[in-house]
């Protein structure tokens, strides 16, 4: 799973999830907010990209769930240095998990005050070039995120109670709230700069 700590990106440790190695990054850019995001992620079942970022319960004894192909593909994209925009349109649902994740990354970069940075402009340009990979509704959400327009759940995160945030994110689709939080966590913990 992707976890931040104070070690370098090259440090690795054995993981139980899909037999992979969790990626370590530099210390979180915003430890308090990223801690809240991680707490929120821990309230979700293993939907969307959640298993890449938090420990999820193992399958019951004697059962072997096949690895989710979207998770496997996402993990490959995030670990190999492939363009993060390869996530556009990846997954199922009205707004695919990859698109929700990218909205979260854009929100995280915005929260870190990086909207005017070269990284943000480059990511936005790449997303714009690849919007044809997803559906019209999801493309509209990505355009809004590139313009700094985010859901109420994202805008109020940190200014409302944990319980209110929890409810707002859980109200966003089957896995969209969770996938957005994964992207936000990815950006807030500096993982975007290591792997994006």
Q: PLM ranges: what are they?
A:
Residues 117-121:
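Acidic, glycine-rich low-complexity/disordered segments
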Residues 1-12, 19-21, 25-89, 93-98, ...:
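Phosphate/adenylate-binding glycine loop and adjacent helical scaffold
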Residues 189-195:
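Intrinsically disordered, low-complexity linker/propeptide segments enriched in Ser/Thr/Gly/Pro
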Residues 101-102, 113:
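Internal, well-folded beta-alpha domain core
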